[in-house]
Amino acid sequence: MSAWGAAVAVIAGLVLPSAASSPSSAASAAFNYGEALQKSLWFYDAQRSGKLPDDNRVSWRGDSALDDGKDVGLDLTGGWYDAGDHVKFGLPMAFSATLLAWGGVEQKSAYAASGQLQHLQDNLRFVNDYFIKAHPSANVLYGQVGNGADDHKWWGPAEVMPMARPAYKIDASCPGSDLAGQTAAAMASSSMVFADSDPAYASKLLTHAKQLYAFADAYRGKYSACITDAQAYYNSWSGYNDELVWGAVWLYKATGDAAYLAKAESAYDKLSTEPQTTTRSYRWTLSWDDTSYGSYVLLAQLTGKQRYVDDANRWLDWWTVGVNGTKVRYSPGGQAVLDSWGSLRYAANTAFAALSYSDWLTGDPVRKARYHDFAVRQINYALGDNPRKSSYVVGFGANPPTKPHHRTSHGSWTDQLTNPVDNRHVLYGALVGGPSAADDAYTDDRSNYVNNEVATDYNAAFTGALARLYAEYGGSPLADFPQAEKPDGPEISVQASVNASGPGFTEIKAYLINKSAWPARALTRASLRYYFTLDGGVTPDRISTTTNYNQCGKVTGPTHFEGDVYFVTVDCSNAVIAPAGQSAYRKEVQFRITSTGAWNPANDWSYQAVPTTPGSTPVDAPHIVLTEGADTQWGAEPDGTTPTPTPTPTPTPTPTPTPTPTPTPTPTSPSTQCAVTYTVTSTWNGGFTADVGVRNTGAAAVNGWRLGFSFKGAEKVTNAWNATVSQTGPDVTVANVAHNATIPPGSSTSFGFQGTGTPAGAPAAFTLNGKDCG
């Protein structure tokens, strides 16, 4: 019997406790729901943008995106990064906040008993403080910060993002009822979480929520028609009427004002229906785009009216036993799979709503048990009760994912998704997308954003469901969580070797290296010190310095240290050294120290441990000192002192560095041997998504690629990821982005796109860099 089966067997003979039940009265738990709740909530700490609070719990996160809003003269810092990227998308952010708050409203006692209530409130305050900034006047709301394409083409930690981050808004001249209505719901629901502990803050949130709802109601429109950059990522497919219902429902719950209930019920009549029927839609679920299903549940609970009960029952029946001969797909292992992209997110959203509805439902014991058991099964599947016997929550349970598609937790310093091989940080609590089909199959692959990305909306209802299961089954949050991570090696260092030498000189080749990730930080005032000893009565005026190749600034000295020991200084304050790319994380300088008298480098302090054969590969040079301003970051001085590196407490936003020209590498001719896979991953009425894989089957690397093909039908690409796409008629040209420009022999890269039209099958032929590809 599976863990879930055992749990259900125990539950079957009991009267199901209410959501407020003490954990001590519950049946035995299949999993430690206390730990899962604790870690799922911590994930939101890791997603924070802007200035972090003094009690920041994520040892590898620092301040980031401190210039957000400057382009429009506002402070738009704060909020949450959306997913594994760093755009702040307002619609899913507000949806996530609403779902988190809903869980807090219904499961306050569970949050308190588990010791997580303060963390819930901290995260809701953090995101709502951002919503307040983003709503500078009644009919203005900033709904996105960061350009999607610019953000996605770069792979690195949030603290050193090099790109500009434009702000986008809706207003009375170009409105977005969906965005404003959802943000109103977020602030109204959050006000309920703070009503007892901070009534003044709750009142402030309600003021903004009322203004935002009035804005949404008075000026109708889809936000993605105004914030057009969002169309490729969070287009408002369902329109705005669902958010007008949703926002009014939450304002009614928060205020008790019957006028909001009347608005919700009036707008409800305009919610979508199944094709060519008057039946409310039931073959989808609660999500960032469509909140109708949450309104079914909440209006049933608030009014008891049969039409809302019928709509909620029909929806949840489709997810469990089926309606009119159809139901959601199920995998052999029991996962309800609605869609290929983030399938566990949809199952968790439905599970949370099912638990809320089941707790309220009376007079229908069959459905009450059905919906409850469905929810327990789906959450337990994500926690590890599945054919793989593996958790889908990072840092929790058995065999959890270790390579989520998440830039900052990966910690690359070279702007490469593949480097390093392993993620440098554990993104505790993050729910990954999960299987893309109803087959229980999954691979922990960082490059697979469909199955392995994480997002704030993935965890929102999941966290609430965990709180509900903690209330019923109990569990023990970890007493020592979180523990500060230890760096995986030197974050900032100097590597050096002898570049050339002679009777009166030594030339050193040195790299100033920044691979920082605890947190990532930029060096903007770096300097290097090389210590040496004067020999045979040579005076300092007989020493000179020159440079052969220099990505830094001036080389000065010699400067007296003590006795016969002097040092030369290489000033790198003209450069930004940051873990932000292959030319950004490392600066090279080749400097020569020449004496017109005696010269013996063997007794020089900084010469120790440096390879002395000219042309040797540079290695760590522990006797060369690297400083950032007055703070030593690397190396020991001649007195034997090895100072403790001092992290920069507030990372400086990194402008795009201007690289010093370096020798141009010899280009490698692209291989003409290749193989292409073309897979349509999902379809809907009028649209589809596809994944394309390109494999280098030749013996030479492909450095820079352009893939060409022609559609068989009238398909048209609307947006793409991991590539740039242009189209003329049926002819499509796809070009690499920075992080996947090189395809080594025997390796593959992939990209995906969304299109309109009906897929007519895979293209008949492909070309790579103008030559036929199989």
Regions from the language model: what does each represent?
Residues 29-42, 46-103, 144-182, 186, ...:
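Aromatic (Trp/Tyr) and acidic
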Residues 577-642, 750-774:
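Terminal connector regions
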Residues 1-24:
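Secretory targeting and sorting signals
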Residues 518-529, 536-545, 700-708, 717-721:
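Short, hydrophobic/aromatic beta-strand segments
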Residues 639-671:
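Ser/Thr/Gly/Pro-rich low-complexity, disordered linker/stalk segments of secreted
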Residues 496-497, 502-525, 529-533, 685-701:
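Short beta-strand elements of extracellular/lumenal beta-sandwich folds
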Residues 534-574, 716-736, 751:
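A surface/secretory-pathway sequence property marking extracellular, secreted
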Residues 474-505, 669-686:
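Low-complexity, acidic Ser/Thr/Pro/Gly-rich terminal tails and inter-domain linkers that flank the onset
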